[in-house]
Amino acid sequence: MNLFELSQNIGKINQNKVISDSIKNVNDELNGLTKDRMCKVYSSYVYNELKKNHILARLINTNDLGFDYEHQFILVQINKLTKDYYLIDLTYSQFIKNIEDEKVFTELLNKGYQKINNELWIQYLKNILRNNNVNSSIDEAFNKEINNNRINL
């Protein structure tokens, strides 16, 4: 466990509340802008809010994962052992044809974030990339070496 993780545990930071408050602050600041196709703007704002609140988050771009389609979102690690993460994507609704039919990512659609594991990660990537040949681990995406918050492959 690194020093940052220790400091989070000592401070008993409620990641769920910080993420929710960060999304609310971003929505207030960007009031009037459409979320569709604004993934970079929204993700960057939420990422900066999370950083201000000392939450270890990764700004992920699908291009950096080796995919042709570009989309940006955030991962926040909840627990290394269980490999659970929060996925934050305020623009996910653009990938859903019929919101009433969406059963898996209802929290993501309603709250802007959702707790996921590797199985849900694969499903999420398949939904946004419209590709069934997705072979990517959520741990690999989160733990890639980064410079200036960008992933280095």
Listing of model-derived features with the role each one plays in the protein:
Residues 1-153:
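A structural boundary/capping signal
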